[in-house]
A protein has these predicted regions:
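Solvent-exposed N-terminal domain segments of exported/luminal and surface proteins
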Residues: 1-121, 128
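A broad, low-specificity signal for short, low-complexity segments enriched in glycine/proline
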Residues: 55-58, 83-88, 178, 194-198, ...
Length: 260
C-alpha cells in the first residue's frame, strides 16, 4: 500500500484531510511538514488494538497519582479491502475504560475519530460512573485539558499529536540524527512496577534506553488569530514507523515549556 499511496495520495486543498490513500501512511516520500504529520496520524497500527496504560503526575516529594485505562481501538482506515468511501470519514473508533483509581473507575469514553475534522468534527461521549450519566464531549480537541492529566497535557498531545492540523503552519526542517527513546525493553518489562519507574522529576533512567536515530523534524507555529497554550511545537518523527518520538512545546513567549 505504501507504493500505491506514494503514487496517488494527495492533501486536500485546506490540508485538513487526504484523498486517494488508505491503510497506512499516505506520503512515504513527504514534501512538507504537513505530509509528515499526516503520516503519523494515519500510520499503520493493524485493524484492532487493545492495551492497558498507566499515567501518573509525580509531585516534588516523589508521591504520585496513578490513573489506569483500558484502550480498545478499531481502525476503520486500516481495514483490509476498504477504501476512503467506505469508512465514512472515520480513522478509528476508540473505547476507553478507566480501571483505577476507584474514584474514577467505571468511567467510559467513546470516540469516533474523523479524518477531516473541519468537515466533520471528532465525535466523543463520556459516561460518568458516579452520576450514571452519558454526555456528549464536544470540546475534546485542541488545547482542552486532557482528562485525568492534572492539566499537564492538552487533548491534542495524546499520541504526541492528534486531530485537525488547522491551527498551525507546518514546516519541514529536514532530517537529523538525535538520541531518542528507542527499544526500552527494561522499561516495558511486565515485572516492572510504577514505583520502579516514577521519580520526582523524571522517570528512572536505569530503565530508559536511547538510540542515535534519524528522524524527520517538523516545526509547527501557531497561526495568527488562533488561541492555544503552545505557540510553537517541534516534532521528531521516526523515519521508519512515522511515530512521533519526541516533541518540544513552547509557551506564548517562545520559551521551552514542556517536552513529551
Amino acid at each position: 500500500k505504501s507504493r500505491e499511496n506514494a503514487r496517488s495520495a494527495e492533501l486536500l486543498a485546506n490540508g485538513n484531510g487526504v484523498r486517494n490513500t488508505i491503510m497506512t501512511s499516505p506520503f512515504p516520500i513527504p514534501k512538507n511538514g504537513l505530509e509528515v504529520i499526516w503520516n503519523h496520524i494515519l500510520r499503520y497500527r493493524g485493524e484492532e488494538l487493545s492495551f492497558r496504560s498507566s499515567s501518573a503526575t509525580p509531585q516534588v516529594n516523589g508521591s504520585y497519582n496513578q490513573v489506569v485505562n483500558q484502550y480498545d481501538y478499531f481502525f476503520a482506515y486500516s481495514r483490509r479491502g476498504t477504501n476512503l468511501a467506505d469508512i465514512d470519514n472515520k480513522i478509528f473508533y476508540l473505547k476507553t475504560d478507566t480501571i483505577a483509581p476507584s474514584s474514577l473507575a467505571g468511567t467510559i469514553t467513546l470516540v469516533h475519530e474523523t479524518l477531516d475534522q473541519i468537515r466533520s468534527p471528532r465525535l466523543a461521549w463520556r459516561y460518568d460512573a458516579g452520576s450514571r450519566r452519558l454526555r456528549r464531549s464536544p470540546n475534546l480537541a485542541y488545547e482542552t485539558d486532557l482528562p485525568n492529566s492534572s492539566s499537564l497535557r492538552s487533548v491534542d498531545q495524546k499520541d504526541m499529536y492528534n486531530g485537525a492540523p488547522n491551527q498551525y503552519d507546518w514546516e519541514l526542517k529536514g532530517k537529523r540524527e538525535i538520541f531518542v527513546p528507542y527499544n526500552a525493553y527494561k522499561l516495558h518489562d511486565a515485572d516492572v512496577q510504577p514505583d520502579d519507574v516514577i521519580r520526582p522529576q523524571h522517570i528512572n533512567q536505569e530503565l530508559a534506553r536511547y538510540e542515535l536515530h534519524r528522524v524527520w523534524v517538523v516545526e509547527a507555529k501557531l497561526r495568527t488569530g488562533i488561541s492555544h497554550i503552545y505557540s510553537r511545537r517541534v516534532f521528531y518523527v521516526d523515519e521508519d514507523s512515522w511515530q512521533i518520538l519526541a516533541t518540544e512545546e513552547y509557551d506564548g513567549n517562545d520559551q521551552l515549556w514542556r517536552v513529551s
